[in-house]
Regions:
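Active-site flanking residues adjacent to catalytic metal/cofactor-binding acidic residues
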Residues: 30, 53, 110
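Adenosine-phosphate binding glycine-rich loop
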Residues: 1-24, 118-148
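Conserved Rossmann-like nucleotide-cofactor binding loop
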Residues: 35, 58, 115
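Rossmann-like adenosine-cofactor binding region
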Residues: 65-139
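NAD(P)-binding Rossmann-fold cofactor-contacting core
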Residues: 46-66
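Glycine-rich adenosine-cofactor-binding loop
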Residues: 23-44
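Residues within well-ordered alpha-helices
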Residues: 39, 59, 120-123
């Protein structure tokens, strides 16, 4: 399944591109559709604490039932300051300049959403040089078809 392959690829990228250990880390996951729920399961298996944001209340309820903590949009910036990893699967602008303000350089950010994605790339590169090294496009339109 494509969502499972995306989740495994995302976790592999996170492990490879972060100076901290994924196991037991605080992870933010935005978007709880097929890919988001698959990533949640992988992170849960690694013993991570997962905080989910999704604008859909039903998606939040599913995430909560699966063991995730739920975050409101207004609290994303505060939670991000404590997180080690951010996995975005939301295809609309969630991570704006305002929300990303003051983000620690150590946070490993992975953009998995279809273009245009949910992360304001200019804000990241302006605020934290280190993000250019870890910001990855794990899932692209035909990437998994060629690999799997």
């Amino acid at each position: 399944e494509n969502a499972a392959a995306t989740a495994e690829g995302a976790v592999a990228e996170a492990v490879q591109n972060s100076p901290v250990t994924l196991r037991g880390s605080l992870c933010i996951l935005t978007g709880y559709g097929r890919c988001g729920s698959a990533i949640h399961q992988c992170l849960k298996n690694w013993g991570c604490t997962i905080v989910v944001y999704d604008c859909d209340e039903n998606a939040c309820e599913r995430a909560k039932e699966a063991g995730a903590k739920i975050c409101e949009y207004k609290d994303l910036s505060k939670v991000l300051k404590k997180a080690a990893f951010l996995f975005n699967t939301a295809p609309s602008a969630v991570w704006t300049e305002r929300v990303l303000e003051g983000v620690p350089q150590e946070v490993c950010i992975l953009e998995l959403a279809s273009m245009p994605g949910g992360i304001d790339r200019e804000s990241i590169s302006m605020s934290c040089r280190a993000f250019r090294d870890v910001l990855r496009r794990v899932h692209q339109a035909d990437c998994w078809e060629r690999r799997f």
